[in-house]
Amino acid sequence: MARVDPAIAAPPLRLHNHDGFLFFFLLLLLFSSVDASVHSYIGEKFTPKGNAFILHGGSEGLYASLPHANATAGRGDSFIRFEKITFTRPEKSVENSKDTDSVLVQAIIFEVEDRETIGGSAYGGQRAICCTPDLAKLGACTQGTVIYRPSTQNPKWPQVLAATFNGKDLVTTLPSQNIPITRTGMFNLYFIYCDPALNGLVIEGKTVWKNPTGYLPGRMAPLMNFYGFMSLAFVILGIFWFSQYVRFWREVLPLQNCITFVIALGMLEMAFWYFEYAEFNDTGLRPMGITFWAVTFGTVKRTVSWVIILVVSMGYGVVRPTLGGLTSKVIMLGATFFLASEILELVENAGAVSDFAGKARLFLVLPVALLDAFFIIWIFTSLSKTLDKLQARRLIAKLDIYRKFTNALAVTVVVSVGWICYELYFKSNDVYNGHWQNAWIIPAFWQVLSFSLLCVIAALWAPSQNSMRYAYSDDGSEDFDREDSFSLIKPGPVSSKDARGSAGLMDARAAVSNDTTTSHDGDIEEDKRE
């Protein structure tokens, strides 16, 4: 009897997860990829992998159906539903077919922990997904079908569905049905055929994936409540900030107007994300309008935040009235960051994106990561110069607030680097997305971190009756730009009139000094005589 060794993983799983790991390695801010719960297939073709032809149909974390689920209301039950799945093969593939011929196309659903049950080999040889003639002769499987073994945890899984081309049929249909989910896990769907004669086969239709609480994928479901919490947090911050703003509106600085704008953008972003997730949960499809505005408000907020932190680090509005020649460079950097981030976020969030990130996304991630790094370097370089000048002029109040600001940024950068290291560890040890229930923490953390930094900045620069002491004052003692230009100005020739005036002034000062000295010496002599 032949010994059938289980395959550790199907080839497409290894390939795409490797791409996902590279994506997280290159991404400094990180986010998990997103799947829509309604997966549509529109003329998609199969890819050869080993001795099989494969199409990835979806991958989502699903929770088990709740006991006594209310099927009428659609709440409590968890399933994968196949709707109007049709396969069409090209006419040339049936030229040599006989009326008695039959060819299978199979859909296989398995939980990620059961991946070793897919595929096998005879006598420990090369693993294959489709049954080989040698295995068929030994009775281990049926030639032309996918090799799989029942799961040790759930004998009814993997679930395998089949559609058959009979004779010269050009179209076949996969029966519409629901696959109930009775065990919590990360489920994968693959469409597979083994006969090379079906080369050029295309698929049409859709599958619907549902959790007990709605259509949100399992690893995204906690984010809906998270964005609701963040919306409340921004409201609380907004109440504090706007109350201070109204009380001391006569003392408000331009910088504080910018912070007001960022807080308002944050409120809008969190509210739109919450409603986007709520709509997604109800319908299984992302609402394009809400998603677009959520992404745009978020991108504008991040761009404005970067620019504000940069110009504050340069001392704008506090120790210098303008940015001078740097204005155009700051605007150009901000505009480039906005464009790169907006494209990346729209690609990640608009529509159905596979759990396994494509290579094309790397080209969108790299510019954003490089721009982030450039912002950080420029910010800390500018802060160092500003702190040195404040310390040299002994501007204690401004120096104190800038030191606190620098410390807050430094802590944020250190925590960010630490979290990136954790992301790398998390993804490298979760190649098959087995820890999907905790994946939502990664994007949530970045939101919490940015909100925390915003709270610190709001506390440091909150409007108050003393706000004007942090404003730029044109008294000559703080004009950094003017001081920098002094060393570049060459003294001009002095006229004879000016020279005489200067000499006279120096003589007068010397006379006063001598009189004072004489008087002082006289007092000393008088004291001695007494």
Regions found by a protein language model. Name each.
Residues R286-E530:
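Generic detector of multi-pass transmembrane helix bundles and their immediately adjacent loops
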Residues V112, C194, R247, V318, ...:
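Residue-level marker of positions within ordered structural domains that often coincide
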Residues P11-N17:
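Extended, basic/acidic-rich, low-complexity regulatory helices/tails in eukaryotic proteins
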Residues A2-P6, H18-M220:
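Soluble extramembrane domains flanking the early transmembrane region of eukaryotic membrane proteins
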Residues V208-M332, F338-L339:
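Hydrophobic alpha-helical transmembrane segments corresponding to the first two to three helices
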Residues F187-F191, F242, S313, L383:
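Structural signal for hydrophobic/aromatic residues that build the beta-strand cores
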